Amino acid sequence: MAYDAKKIYYRFDDHLSRLVLDYEASRQISPESENLYHGLPTDPYDEGLFVEHNVKRGLRNADGSGVVAGLTRISDVHGYNKIDGKVVPDQGKLTLRGYNIEDLVNNAQAENRYGYEEVAYLLITGSLPNKEELDGFCERLGAFRHLSDEYVKEFPMTTVSSSIMNVLQRAVLLLYAFDAEPDAITPEHEIDVAISMLARLPRIAAFAHMASVAKRRGSEVHVPHPTPGLSTAETILQVLRGGMAFTRDEAMLLDVMLMLHAEHGGGNNSTFACRVLSSSATDPYSADAAAIGSLKGPRHGGANAKVVSMHEDIRAHVSNWEDEDEVAAYLGKILDKQAFDGTGLIYGMGHAVYTLSDPRAEVCRHYARSLAAKKDLGEEFALIERIERLAPQVMRDHGMTKPICANIDLYTGFIYKMLGVPETLFTPLFAVARMAGWSAHRMEELFCAHRIIRPAYRPVIEPLEYKPLADR
């Protein structure tokens, strides 16, 4: 099915222009009303108030560990031990339903098969599938990949945005209207919606990218029918490349990335957002859209693009990539806010939980190396490894005392670029993969927790006497 993108976007742009004019007109306000903009309090609260009231800022304890807000059987993100009340760094470990992530990835790769579907089944059901169960699950995913003509007629209008993550939110909310019982809260309905999301979101994300390209070119938007029997990784590459113009190695590496991003505990911002909404017993589409909105934030899911920009900056300003002293000196400039974006951050280094190692980063490094060599990108890959090795010492030299290790984002952007994935899809692919974890956590919150999440905020305001309007 094809749509005239130029016509669609012209209609939207005309509407947007009217909105901009209306907004500018609304800004023609009296000087007295400027307080509406300049009177907004933006000063941070006195640090002493947080200590006085024992506030767990960011739901973190004073030692940086997370406040325990619930129990889960879905995954374990381990990066330290607590001994005698103190945080003791440890090698990172990620287990999904009790299974080590390295074992899940390595076994799928050793058997030369795609593993994301197995991980999704494991997360949703709580057990590893046998071959018959896995084949049946993949068959159901294939059946759900199709987007109905009625949905596609509406969906192109939702693709008008500078952010594909914003498009995904609206696309997910639109699916509510095509569900016969969208507010049903039963295990059967939740599993059906989860499978629907796992199947459709990869194509929706890729289609949203194609629509934005069509807008720039003034061409039609084509919605190809899904090809039966393809894995999630193959489905994504098929839409992006307009056919099967990709290698098995490329699809297998993308599959590894999907597996590594599928789940990462209940306390990360997007999963917690999904659980917060689910605790109110709202519909799954609303909870999933909220999780996507959280992941869109640059403090959560948007770091991989920053890492790519930083790598490009380092390659441009370091003349000899093999000179460790020169690389370390430039990393020092970044920390001193004299290079790159001026934030003083080395992106891709450090994590809220992992201290000595991020197991996902180690898996990324292992599987990316061979494809980088095949694509003649070995020197760029070696530079990233050099950054990973040198950055912790450079950061210690700048006074940082906590253990620092590379996180998965250090390699993610490089891998996606190597696979030809456009930067605008980096975070959307994160969302595509994480839908498995979000779905599992939503069901656990709905059927095991049975209580709405409602923390408290301590008021730090003084009582005031009301003045009549004429006396102000």
Task: Please report, for each region that a protein language model flagged, where it lies by residue.
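Non-transmembrane, aqueous-exposed alpha-helical and coiled segments at domain scale
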Residues: 2-472
